[in-house]
Amino acid sequence: MALKGQEDYIFHFKDSSHPVDFLDAFRTFYMDGLFTDITLQCPSGIIFHCHRAVLAACSNYFKAMFTADMKEKFKSKIKLSGIHHDILEGLVNYAYTSQIEITKRNVQSLLEAADLLQFLSVKKACEQFLVRHLDIDNCIGMHSFAEFHVCSELEKESRRILCSRFKEVWQQEEFLEISLEKFLFILSRKNLSVWKEEAILEPVIKWTAHDVENRIECIYNLLSYINIDIDPVYLKTALGLQRSCLLTENKIRSLIYNALNPMHKEISQRSTATMYIIGGYYWHPLSEVHIWDPLTNVWIQGAEIPDYTRESYGVTCLGPNIYVTGGYRTDNIDALDTVWIYNSEGDEWTEGLPMLNARYYHCAVTLGGCVYALGGYRKGAPAEEAEFYDPLKEKWLPIANMIKGVGNATACVLHEVIYVIGGHCGYRGSCTYDKVQSYNSDINEWSLITASPHPEYGLCSVPFENKLYLVGGQTTITECYDPEQNEWRETAPMMERRMECGAVIMNGCIYVTGGYSYSKGTYLQSIEKYDPDLNKWEIVGNLPSAMRSHGCVCVYNV
């Protein structure tokens, strides 16, 4: 009997727990062997009793198999070749639980199976796992793997490492086994990070000499792809010294001719990276993003930082993304834990997950596919806490505390080790710290490795040619530290004193941007470049405006 006057009353009920309960019920059916209507069999003979509807809901492969006019449509048992039972078990469990465990041991086999069986979400998760663990040791193999399985993000990011760190890549054992086609692909990249002819000729000679009988004729083609000037004297010397090539004088002369007169060679400098200037300070916080190509000396402006009232933040880049972490507001000195992420490909900002600890005047670096935030200030005192953001897990995780909390220090990464140099210590920066702290992520441990000859704060550090270079600060002194030899040496002094400047490695040189000159009492707009071969600094351009405390990173666009 209808309630009087309520005939049009409708209540739309939705049980939010129903999807979970539904999945749990099918998981129970699977575990108990209830209502199953299809059996999957591995090459090892292990079988899994499943439900067609569940498999079809997760896999386009099984959906097509069970709905199209195929013989498997009517079979009760499907034999799957080439898939290990552990991998198939993981995919079947995923179908019933929405969860799967991905490890370094199983990720490639799991991606291959997910690609074959079209478990698209699992394939994407495996791809992101591999991107997270990319490095110079595996980027060549991962690039080929990504091409074969059509993993666009993995292909792009492995190519980014391959091109941006080519000098390190070609010294890996994996490089000697690459195919001619892969080598030609590498050499044909317009953004390949090579700036000197020996930097590209040496890997060509090394690769050829590794299998001289089968590769000697390939060298004609390889040399023709080198898009920089080739000195015939150098080429002749390099080929002649590589005795394993067993080249006659006539063949060397022929190689030189072909290298200097190729069909498709365009002799030009390669722009290997683009500089990004993020925010900064000029009497007040700056919110602009400026982008510079050093070859054309052209500046363009990107999307502004959404949170434009902060200063003294940390900036680092991971792939195409630039992370801005922490800082403090101009109207107070309360440390911030907020994070903003700038995507250089889309020219857009998104807010990231907040850090575990608020901090300002801290160091930010990238290591092993993660973003690290180290030390800094909080409530006027230097903080020892350090943490990292794992983009795959989408969370910040703590690491061991620093030996000494420092603010306004500098940090960089060399050979998978983080170095934190100098900075302020003591309440409100009452002391300058003279030690270099290093962090080994494999054992989650900090060490004191050396003392700086000139303790400083507000300076920058960059890794270059297996050494650390320290620039900026209150003096023009430039120092170079060799971790392997544990030795310091001074190089040519800079042209300006640059407190809280920016510094990056681009095109085989060190670029230092902006800063504040205490001797002149002015903010600086100029850009200095250091050529390590000449041991010389020169002014090469200007920032769009004078500034200090800005982010300065380079992104290899692919």
Swiss-Prot record:
Record's keyword terms, sorted: Kelch repeat, Repeat
Database matches in Pfam families: BACK (PF07707), BTB (PF00651), Kelch_1 (PF01344), Kelch_KLHDC2_KLHL20_DRC7 (PF24681)
Gene3D superfamilies: 1.25.40.420, Kelch-type beta propeller (2.120.10.80), Potassium Channel Kv1.1, Chain A (3.30.710.10)
Kelch repeat copies, ranges: 274-320, 321-369, 370-416, 418-466, 467-508, 510-557
Residues covered by the BACK domain: 139-240
PANTHER family: KELCH PROTEIN, RING FINGER DOMAIN AND KELCH REPEAT-CONTAINING PROTEIN DDB_G0271372
Name the UniProt record assigns to this protein: Kelch-like protein 23
Species of origin: Mus musculus
Lineage per the UniProt record: Eukaryota, Metazoa, Chordata, Craniata, Vertebrata
